[in-house]
Every structure is written in structure tokens, then in C-alpha cells.
Amino acid sequence: MSIDDVIYVICLLGCIGAGSYVKKIADEGQRKLVSTGLGVLVVVIVSGLHSLHCFVSLALGTAAVLLVHPSKGHLVTFAVMFGYLVFFRIFDFYFGIPGHTNMIQMILTLKVSGIAFEKTAAWKRLQAHDEQKKNDQRDVHQESPIEITDYDVELQSLSAAEILHYSFNYIGVLTGPYYRYRTYRDYFEMPFKTYAPTVEATLEKLKYAVFYCALYLATNYMWPLDYALSDEFFNDRSFVYRLLYVWPTFFTFRARIYTGLTLSECVCTMAGFGAYPDESDPNNGEGPRKRYQHLKRDADKHTYNFTTIVNTRVLEVERCWTFREGMKHWNVCVQYWLAVNVYKLFPSKKYRTGATLLCSAYWHGFRPGHYFCIMGAPFYVSLEDMWDKLVRKSATGTSRRVIDVIFWIFKWFAFSYLGEAFLLSSFGNIWRFYSSVYHIGYISWAAMTALGFYLTSQRKAAERRKKRAAEKAAGGDGIAAAIEKEKAQ
């Protein structure tokens, strides 16, 4: 474990410990100041002088949110925050920036641009509501009334101080999870944190974090990624060994990510952040999907969960059968941001999936490995979907269970093979490794795609022949019936 990782873990543990103190501060304004102060302190400890990038980008993004008209503010803020990543990573290329500073900048980018998207969406609802009110002859049976909330109105009068507090709140400042500005406000305005099982939830997550950390340390010791870059690995190890090495290295990566994300969730749970009643139907990253403001009147009578701040559903990722399902459970808070702000708003439905994945790769970084990995995912998903229709969808019983296991093995091979590019990062390292295993992943997937297309066309042709035969038989029966009728007459 590097010194950066040690500092990172110490900061996370410190933030977890601070949660019980922060939650008890009665004055909401004071609690907000303390939370922001802790966040700034963590950023400076982890980043040093490089923390200036965070402050400069926040200032630029805040100016875009406040000064640009809401109709275009989300686009300008998006361009400013994601554009700053170019400068940030060029600076990193020449001068070097701590890896955890990069994560802080990534989360900050989502938060500031996310609040601009929230403001624009609220402004559009307000405009539509006003337009609806002006139309006195609206048919109530044809068009339901547009509902607006106090939150929609208040978003239009955001202050720079509020954006600063939201952006540098110590909860989530290091590695997330991403949460909406509404979730941040609810923490200070709603009483849910007082009645949520904060200690129990934190202890439960800490158990898992310790388990993941132990797995990470053990597997990283036995199968270090650096070994995959050594001459011995390429000269003395067999093709099979090199190919199978992607499994433990990606497992190590997952264990490391699970450890960090689970500790980040502990920061939230210990402070009671992101706790909502079950009745509010909270979603990862989004928060409540049902009305919940009235629930504060009897807050002590509800059961609570922390779904809003759960960033990765680990058991579902590990146990699900397909690559597509695994993607849905991975980094779900960030996926929510991408789905709402990129996928749904992209003007072309034909290209919006590609645009969303490209945005994700860009957000992760400019290294070739990010694009090999993330942009390769949809090609495997389309292959998997094809074979799912061919062999898995109609299977039952023992056959279905066997096919599920085969899909699960292929799922993890695909994750590991593509993930190896993410880990190796540079084009030279990626090409050297893939060449050493003869690009077997891409070649086998291309062959399976071709075979899948062939079998699909054969199945469709057989279905067409069967349909024509049935129609012909039905037609023949009709002619025979007509002949019999004539004879009877």
C-alpha cells in the first residue's frame, strides 16, 4: 500500500469518526460551516498546493451557474467543469498530481455541473407551469397539471456560499458518493438523521470494508499488477498463465474499489447523511422518488435506509449472471448522474449510448486504457444480448442453470480482460499485454458475434418457413372445406 493510500484511508477514518460529532451539532448553520471546514481540510491534506485546482474550477463553475441564464446554464457549466479537466490532466501529465486529488476533482466536476442541471430542470418546470396557468382553456382531462415545489423556486436563487458548502462538504469530498444538492439540503433541514440507525449501519459496512481490504492486501501481494509489466512475465510465463492473470489482477482492483467505496459510505452513514424513510422510495444518487416532506412530522415512527448513498451493490455485481446486469450495479450513483444529465438529454437517441460512455471515459481520464475498457463494454454487451436470446432466454431447469454459470464465467472474463486495459493504462503496456495473449478476447468475441449473426439468421429463416407452411396448410384446409361444401350442395 502506497503512502497516498495510507493518507487516504486515515482521512476516511477521520471523516467517519467526525460523523458522530457533526450529527449532534444542533445549529444547522454551524453544522454546515463545520462540514465545509472539514471538507476543505481534507482536500488540503490530501492535495497540498494542488488543491488550488479544486478552488479555481469551483470558482469558474459557480460563476457559470449563477451568471448564465438557466436556459443555457447547464450547458455552459458542463463545458466549464469538463473543460477544466483538460487543463487539470495536462498539468498532471507534466507535473504530476496525487491520484486522490484526481478523484476529488472528478467528484467536484459532477457536483457543480449537476447542480446546474438541477437548476435548469427546475426553471423549465417553472416556465411550463406558468405557461399552463396562462392557458385558461386547458383541458384538464387531456393534460395533467405540472407540479412545482419550493425546491424548484429556491434553486433559482442559489448563492455562491451554498454551492461552496455543497461542493466541499466533507461527506463525499474524497471519493463520493455523488449525491444531489437536494440530498445535501435535506441533511440540514430534515430530522431523518436523528432517527436513522447510523451506528448499526456504519458497523455493518465497516465489517465488509475490513473484509474487502484483507482480500485486496492478500491478492495484491500474490498477484501484483507490476508483475504484468515485467520482462519475466512475458518471457518466462506461458500463454495460459498470462491470459489467466487478468482474473486475479481485476479481482484485486475490485477489492480495492470496494474498500474505498464502502468506507466512503461509512462516512455518510455515521453522520446520518442520505437517510430517508422507506416510504419515500429512495434511489441511488437520486434520493426519494416519492413525496417525503410530510414524513418529518412523525419521523420517529419510520424505518430508514441509506440507499441514496450506496454507490456499488457489491453482492449483486459479484453474483449476477450477465455483464449487462453487472454494469447496472457498479458505481450506480455516477451512473445516475450520467443517465439523467447525458443519456436522457442527448439530442440523438441513436448515438446517446455512445455519447454517455464517451463522457464516462473522458471523466475517468485521458489515458488510452480508459477508452479501451469503457468503450469496449457496449460491444460485449451486444454480443451477450445476442447469445442470451439464442440460448439462455428459452432455457429452463438444469440447462438454464448450466447456461447461467457459463454466462457468469464469460462475464468475469470480459470484465477482467477489458479491465486489464484500464489498469495497464498506457497504449504501449496495453498493446504488449494483448499481443502476448494474441488478442484472444477481441478475436473470440468477433467470432462469437459472427456465429451469433449466422445462427440468428438461420433461426429467423426457419421461423419464416414454418410460418409459410402454416399459412399454406391453413389455405389448403380452406380449399378442401370449400370443395366439400360444393359437393354437399
Curated annotation (Swiss-Prot):
Reaction it catalyzes: a 1-acyl-sn-glycero-3-phospho-(1D-myo-inositol) + (5Z,8Z,11Z,14Z)-eicosatetraenoyl-CoA = a 1-acyl-2-(5Z,8Z,11Z,14Z-eicosatetraenoyl)-sn-glycero-3-phospho-(1D-myo-inositol) + CoA; a 1-acyl-sn-glycero-3-phosphocholine + an acyl-CoA = a 1,2-diacyl-sn-glycero-3-phosphocholine + CoA; (9Z)-hexadecenoyl-CoA + 1-hexadecanoyl-sn-glycero-3-phosphocholine = 1-hexadecanoyl-2-(9Z-hexadecenoyl)-sn-glycero-3-phosphocholine + CoA; a 1-acyl-sn-glycero-3-phospho-L-serine + an acyl-CoA = a 1,2-diacyl-sn-glycero-3-phospho-L-serine + CoA
Superkingdom as given in the UniProt entry: Eukaryota
EC number: 2.3.1.-, 2.3.1.23, 2.3.1.n6, 2.3.1.n7
Catalytic residues as annotated in Swiss-Prot or TrEMBL: 331, 364
Pathway given in the UniProt record: Lipid metabolism; phospholipid metabolism
Cellular component GO terms, alphabetical: membrane; mitochondria-associated endoplasmic reticulum membrane contact site
Enzyme class: transferase
Predominant location: membrane
Pfam families: MBOAT
Compartmental location: Membrane
UniProt-listed GO biological process terms: lipid modification; phosphatidylinositol biosynthetic process
InterPro entries, alphabetized: LPLAT_7/PORCN-like, MBOAT_fam
Bilayer disposition of the protein: Multi-pass membrane protein
Transmembrane regions listed in the UniProt entry: 2-22, 40-60, 75-95, 405-425, 433-453
Gene Ontology molecular function, alphabetical: lysophospholipid acyltransferase activity
Keywords, in A-Z order: Acyltransferase, Membrane, Transferase, Transmembrane, Transmembrane helix
Family stated for the protein in its record: Belongs to the membrane-bound acyltransferase family.
Function field: Acyltransferase that mediates the acylation of lysophospholipids to produce phospholipids (glycerophospholipids).
Protein name: Membrane-bound acylglycerophosphatidylinositol O-acyltransferase frj
The organism of origin for this protein: Drosophila melanogaster (Fruit fly)
Organismal lineage: Eukaryota, Metazoa, Ecdysozoa, Arthropoda, Hexapoda
Gene that specifies this protein: frj
